[in-house]
């Protein structure tokens, strides 16, 4: 947490107000009049309900005064039961200033666009990533694994959705929720590719895991940070209703540094769910991006077929492991496959490995990232300044 304290002044700019700070990530694509409001720790449910009623009344009073038909207002409510409570919506400057002046508000963050972390497509390339997970040397062509293969584990794919009818999922993929639009389908393809790497029968690391689509990004592969956090909350609550110790989640997406996003990610980990996150594709220090900069998640950088850092991959002390992320073949909506590159492709290898190890009884939750790091091979060349050189491995040596 000391390290995170050093990051914050570098990563966030704050508007000086008479009350809670209004934070904004430098270079972020902010959503006009969009805000995420986070309550102070210890706020009771009753006080939170009263606060939201007050916000609704203030907002509607402003609309009536202006004679406006632009509804806006509160859109998402967050209560992770793990030290993160708040809400998000669209408010005018006067309203957000009143909210900031409340004693029960910890901070306010400008809502921003979050994007999928895949960057390029190349057809007809060799599929090497899956084989690399079970090989001690590069160039392997086979993937060796225990037949449990993540059976009994649920993987939440927080992304663009999943083509749950794709034959590679064998009926193990189901729709969970949609916080971004009204199209309950993967109209982008990114999420289906990620799900295939996590748990596809042909392309996946954990071939018997159950896959749940949590759609937070639209057909263009983008969405608001507030919608992403709403999807994170849904996944945590759904897993907690079952057995969070047998749940993993993947977030192959990101944006500028967001204290709210990191706080939500940390709440998921505290709930006992293993969370794998893409480091990002800007060839920069991952500390400037979220949720990759949250220290308690398992942040994955991308490697290429020769066991080096992929040119686009983010790096830094907050990267936990490397995983295959360049020219990765996996499922595409409507059937068949395609190749994508990005830390988006690295993270689901880590998520799938987490599900695989839970199925073997090798751990769960946040501690699972430490297990994965211990099992990883110190083989990555030129990993980046201050960055681990460890590449994931499932322990089945070839």
Swiss-Prot record:
Inhibitor I9 domain sequence ranges: 35-115
The entry's keywords: Glycoprotein, Hydrolase, Protease, Secreted, Serine protease, Signal, Virulence, Zymogen
Molecular-function GO term, any one: serine-type endopeptidase activity
Ranges for domain Peptidase S8: 127-398
Enzyme class of the recorded protein, top EC level: hydrolase
Sugar-bearing residue positions: 220, 250
Location (main, coarse): secreted
Subcellular location(s) per record: Secreted
Highest taxon listed in the record's lineage: Eukaryota
The keyword Amino-acid biosynthesis is annotated on this UniProt entry: no
InterPro entries registered for this protein in UniProt: PCSK9_ProteinaseK-like, Peptidase_S8/S53_dom, Peptidase_S8/S53_dom_sf, Peptidase_S8_Asp-AS, Peptidase_S8_Ser-AS, Peptidase_S8_subtilisin-like, Peptidase_S8_subtilisin-rel, S8pro/Inhibitor_I9
Annotated active site: 159 (charge relay system), 190 (charge relay system), 344 (charge relay system)
One GO BP annotation of this record: proteolysis
Coiled-coil segments: none
UniProt KW Secreted keyword: yes
Name by which UniProt lists this protein: Subtilisin-like protease CPC735_050320
């Amino acid at each position: 947490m000391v390290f995170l304290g050093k990051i914050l002044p570098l990563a966030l700019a704050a508007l000086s107000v008479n009350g809670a700070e209004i934070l904004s990530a430098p270079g972020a694509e902010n959503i006009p009049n969009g805000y995420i409001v986070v309550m102070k720790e210890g706020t009771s449910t009753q006080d939170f309900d009263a606060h939201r009623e007050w916000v609704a009344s203030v907002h509607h009073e402003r609309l009536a005064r202006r004679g406006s038909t632009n509804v806006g207002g509160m859109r998402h409510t967050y209560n992770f039961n793990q030290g993160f409570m708040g809400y998000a919506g669209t408010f005018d400057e006067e309203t957000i200033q009143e909210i900031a002046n409340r004693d029960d508000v910890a901070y306010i963050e400008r809502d921003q666009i979050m994007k999928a972390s895949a960057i390029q497509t190349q057809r007809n390339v060799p599929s090497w990533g899956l084989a690399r997970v079970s090989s001690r040397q590069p160039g392997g062509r086979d993937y060796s694994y225990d037949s449990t293969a993540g059976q009994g584990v649920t993987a939440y794919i927080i992304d663009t959705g999943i083509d749950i009818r794709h034959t590679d999922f064998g009926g193990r993929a189901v729709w969970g929720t949609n916080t971004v639009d009204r199209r309950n389908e993967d109209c982008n393809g990114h999420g289906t590719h990620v799900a295939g790497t996590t748990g596809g029968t042909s392309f996946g690391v954990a071939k018997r895991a159950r896959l749940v689509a949590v759609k937070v990004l639209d057909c263009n592969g983008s969405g608001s940070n507030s919608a992403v956090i709403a999807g994170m909350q849904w996944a945590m609550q759904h897993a907690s209703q079952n057995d969070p110790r047998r749940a993993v989640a993947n977030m192959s997406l990101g944006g500028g540094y967001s204290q709210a996003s990191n706080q939500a990610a940390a709440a998921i980990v505290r709930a006992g769910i293993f969370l794998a996150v893409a480091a990002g594709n800007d060839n920069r220090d991952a500390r400037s991006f979220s949720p990759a900069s949250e220290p308690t998640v398992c942040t994955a950088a991308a490697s290429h077929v020769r066991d080096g850092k992929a040119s686009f991959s983010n790096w830094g002390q907050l990267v936990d492991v490397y995983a295959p992320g360049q020219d990765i073949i996996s499922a595409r909506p409507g059937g068949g496959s395609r190749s994508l590159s990005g830390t988006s492709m690295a993270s689901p290898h880590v998520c799938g490995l987490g599900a695989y190890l839970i199925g073997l009884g090798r751990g769960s939750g946040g501690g699972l990232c430490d297990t994965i790091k211990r099992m990883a091979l110190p083989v990555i060349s030129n990993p980046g300044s201050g960055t681990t050189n460890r590449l994931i491995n499932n322990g089945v040596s070839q």
